[in-house]
Amino acid sequence: MKRQTLIFLGVIFLFVWGCATPGQKFIDITYFGDHEKTQTGQVGIAPFQDKRIDMDMGYVGYRILLDNSQETYFVNGMNLSDTLTRIVGIYFEKNGFTTTRVNPWELTPDGVIKASKGFKQIVAGQINKFECRAKKKGATTDMILDIDLTLYLGISDKNALKTIPVSMTLERTELTFTREKLEQFVNQALEEVFQKALVF
């Protein structure tokens, strides 16, 4: 019986230790929120600008493993700016708007006047910080997600520019960490960001 217990514990140890492997990993970031299509009109969406310093344009975060090696996570497509631009478009479309990609526009009221012709609203965004830091501790993984964005909403009928700073830090502990759980963590956070920041 003692021998069987030792074998069982050995299997559990190998499972906990061996499930994680260092290196590059990729996750899908998208928008899953459900909305009633109560809005109408055309929205122009400019590309998000990534202002993070010394980070790859697709970088999302990392996880430190038990042996201090590291998994590094990137968004599929290797372009976080393009991903967030696409997600904002999905958010507006799920609320009933139609969307069109537009060129970057001057982030001033004059810029709104020049760029918003034919649109109900125009949108731009800036990534100041976006990183998930995770550390494996035995069978669990502690995650800290920092998101800092600046959203710009140009309202055409008022020729007005609304600047919307968004900053949040979220923490979560997962008993069994997987790529899908990291995706869920990030996607839920972004859903909260856009639903609270871009209110109609």
Where are these regions (language model features)?
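A structural "domain/chain start" motif
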Residues: 19-91, 197-200
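Feature marks short, surface-exposed loop/turn motifs that line or immediately flank catalytic pockets
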Residues: 52, 131, 170-172
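Surface-exposed short loop/turn segments
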Residues: 20-30, 104-159
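C-terminal/domain-edge helix-coil "capping" segments
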Residues: 19-41, 96, 141, 152-200
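Short beta-strand->alpha-helix linker/helix-N-cap micro-motif
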Residues: 89, 93-111
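Bacterial N-terminal signal peptides
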Residues: 8-17
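Bacterial N-terminal signal peptides that target proteins for export
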Residues: 1-7
